A protein has these predicted regions:
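Structural/interface elements that position substrates and couple domains in central-metabolism enzymes
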Residues: 1-135
Length: 135
């Protein structure tokens, strides 16, 4: 399972999915967080791979969940979008920007469209793509 976009919401989603357990208590998913190969993206990826949440948070449960995921090694992060080739589920957490021009809201969707194209070119046919946007 991949989570595209490691902003606060995407990073939290990756941690939450990594917490899922089978009835036997085994990690239910191998989760890969994916971000852009930018300085910010690399910093987020590095933090998650070190078991550190990439944003300030007072949510102790999230910090504990990330520590557990790091210990059982079912959460990793990368800037390499080829990981979608082996994903059966992708969760897309890309913010949608709204600009107000002449008091009319204009929704900027180019980041979301680019992410969907990147995933669509690589993810296996029949896989599930879930779009969870923040506005």
């Amino acid at each position: 399972m991949c989570v595209q976009g490691l902003g606060f919401v995407g990073a939290a989603m990756a941690v939450a999915v990594a917490q899922a357990r089978t009835p036997e208590g085994i990690a239910a998913y191998q989760v890969v967080g994916v971000d852009l190969p930018t300085p910010d993206g690399h910093a987020r990826v590095d933090a998650l791979n070190e078991g550190v949440f990439p944003f300030p948070t007072s949510d102790k449960k999230m910090v504990t969940a990330l520590t557990e995921a790091h210990e059982v090694e079912n959460l990793r992060a990368t800037t390499d979008s080829s990981v979608f080739q082996s994903a059966d589920v992708a969760i897309v957490d890309i913010p949608l920007d709204i600009d107000f021009l002449d008091d009319d809201p204009q929704l900027e969707m180019s980041s979301l469209e680019k992410a969907i194209r990147t995933i669509g070119r690589q993810i296996p046919k029949g896989s599930l793509i879930i779009v969870e946007t923040t506005v």
